[in-house]
Amino acid sequence: MMEIGDLLNGKYRIEKLLGKGGTGSVYLCTNIELGNKWAVKHIPSDMASDKTMSEIGILKRLYHISLPRVVDIFRDEQGLYIVESNIEGTDLDSLLKRRGSFAVDIVVDWSLELCDILKYLHGVRPNPIIYRDMKPSNIMLTQGSRLVLIDFGISKEFRRFQSKDTFLAGTRGYAAPEQLIKGGMTDQRTDIYNLGATMYQLLHGRPPGLKAGGFVPSKDRVMLRINDIVSRCLENKPEGRYQRAEDVKQELQSVKNMLVVDGARKRLVYKLEVVLVVVLSMVSYAITVMGLFSK
C-alpha cells in the first residue's frame, strides 16, 4: 500500500491520490531531481494486461500538445508504473453537469480543436491510431482553455490487413454501431461518430443514444447547419459519415464563419438602433425647443 511521501523509483515523491479505478490508481508525484509534477499511474501486477501494454505502446508514439505525454515507465514488486503529463483542469462531463449544455460558438471552437487532435491521431504512421472512446468525460479543459484528450485504454492501431476487431470496445451512448457488434471493424470513421455524439451532448445536454427525440427544432440558420453536421457524423453506416476529421473541420469552419457574419450583423443592427434612438431624441428635443420659442 502506497502512502503520501513514498518515493517511487527513487525519484517520484507521492503528493496525493488523484483517482482510483478498476485497474489501478493515479498519483500526483513530484520528480525530486527536477522539481516538476507528473501523474503516475500504478497498475498492480495482476491487472497489467495486454490491453494496458497496448495503451502504453500507443502513448509512447504520440507527441501533441493536446495529448498526454508518457515520459517514464518502470516496475517494482507492487506492479507497473506509467509516468505521464499531469493535466490540470476539468473534464467536460463535469462542466455539463453544472451547466446543462453550451452555446453553439463554444461547441464549434471545441469541436475544431477535437478535429485537429483526431487528424493528428489518424495521420500517425505506419499505423493510424483510432481513439474509439471520445466522450465529455475523456476530454479535459485545461486552465489555459485548451482541450486535452485522455484515457487511451481502448484505443487501437489501425492495421489494413485486419478484417475485424479482436474485442468489443466503446461506451454506449457514444459508441458507433460497429463498436458494439461482434465482428465489427473500427476505423477513423468510428472516431467521427464518437465526435458527433460528443458534439450532440455539448449542444443538447445529453448523448444521442440515451433518449429519443432527435434534434431540437430550430429556425436559426447556424443551429440548423451544425445539426446537419452532427447528424451526418452520426450516420449508422460508416460510408454515410464524413470520411475524415479534416472534412468535419472544414464544415465546422464554415459554421464559425457564419457566426462571425451573424455577430457582425447583430452589432451593426445594434449600432443602427442606437443611432436611431439618438436621432429621434434629438428631433424630439428640437421640436420641444421650437415649441417653447413659438409661445
Which ranges hold each PLM region?
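C-terminal lobe helix-coil module of Hanks-type protein kinase domains
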Residues: 173-257
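AlphaC helix of the eukaryotic protein kinase fold
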Residues: 44-61
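Protein kinase catalytic-loop region centered on the HRD/HxD motif
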Residues: 116-129
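Conserved short submotifs of the Hanks-type protein kinase catalytic core
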Residues: 77-91, 95
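Conserved N-lobe ATP-binding subsite of Hanks-type protein kinase domains
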Residues: 25
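Activation-segment/catalytic-loop signature of the eukaryotic protein kinase fold
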Residues: 73
